[in-house]
Amino acid sequence: MTSFPHLETDRLKLRSIENSDAVKLFEYFSNREVTKYYGMDSFKTLEEAETLIHTFQIGYQSNKLIRWGIELKETNELIGTCGFHALSQKYKRAEVGYEISHLHWKKGYATEAIKTILDFGFEEMEMIRIGAVVLLANSPSRRVLAPLGFKEEGMLRNYIIQDNIPCDVIMHSLLKEEWIKSSYR
């Protein structure tokens, strides 16, 4: 990939995350409801948001991850991020991750964004497998993945530390051939 790929849906723009997004990222990453299943603590300072943006930018430049900002077309408001991490060009796989501001939950934005990046991952990035690691207690995230065709593969015990407590996760996966044949697209 050369320049950052900007994608669109009917309601959303998926775009690069810029330094100017730090305040908005801080707003929702400082909210415990957003981070309680994220495997990290809620932000306490704006610098943490700036560091995360820098991590996304460096990760993209080094082909280790790609993270899009999720922006509402109607208002140009950044409401979340989504993307792929644990990228392996050699093995043609990645893991998907996403979060949406609590102010925009239950509106279908996560599903809309993930569907779009899955298409991009399988078609443009030529992935053959996309996984998702989800805390066992994170039912909302599992409800996003299931309708898109992700299959639960099994539990990974004590895989993530959340609030200094080892937590179990469920590994999900979606294969390219399943995506191509599915009605989820």
Name what the model sees in each region.
Residues 1-35, 54, 67, 71-185:
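Acyl-donor (CoA/ACP) binding surface of acyl/acetyltransferases
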Residues 42-63:
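Active-site rim helix/loop that mediates acceptor-substrate recognition in acyltransferases
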